[in-house]
Amino acid sequence: MYDYRRMTLQERREVVRERHARGFPLHAPPHFRGVTGDYLITAACFEHRPVFAQPPDLSWLLDETVNAFIEAEIPCRAWVFLPNHYHLVLHTEDMGIMSEIIRLLHSRVATEINGRHHRRGRRVWYRFSDRLIRSERHHWATVNYLHYNAVKHGYVDQMTAWPWSSIHEYLEDRGEAEVLRMWREYPVGDYGRGWDW
C-alpha cells in the first residue's frame, strides 16, 4: 500500500500514467460499481498506526462496523479486526451504497476514537480497498485468510485465541470438523502477499 513512497520519481509517474490510462483514480484504490457479489473489504489505519491497540477500542470498532452493515441489510459473511486494519467479506448489490456506509462509518469512528484518545484532528483512516470474490474457492480461501490474519501478523499463535474474528461464529455454526475441512480444502498459502504483509 505504501510502496509509492519508496518509488523513484520516474516509477511514480509511470504508476500515475497507467492508472490514468485505465480510468482509475490517480492516488486511490478504484471501486467498481454495478457488480453484485461478495467483496473482500480491507481498511487500514493511516500509515498502519495501531489506533485500536486497546481491547475495548477494538471491541467497539468491531461492534460499530458490523452493526453499520446489519442496519443497511448488507450481509457480513466474515471479519477480522486488528489494531491497525480490518478485513470484511460482505455481500452487496451496490458498491456505491457500501462505499457510502464505509465513508460515514470511518468519519464517525475517527471522531469518537480521537475524542477517547484526546487526539482531535488526528487522521485515523487511509482508504479502503474492495476486491470482488470471483469463485467459491476464492470465497473460502478469503474467509480462511481472515480467520488466520491475527496469527499471520503475530498477535496470537492460534486463530481461536483472537476474539475479534468471525472464526468463533464459524465454529459455533458449522462445527470444528467442518471448519477444519474448509481449512484443508481452501488453504491460505501466500494469500495477501503484496498487499497485507
What are these regions (language model features)?
Residues 1-197:
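Short catalytic/metal-binding and nucleic-acid-binding patches
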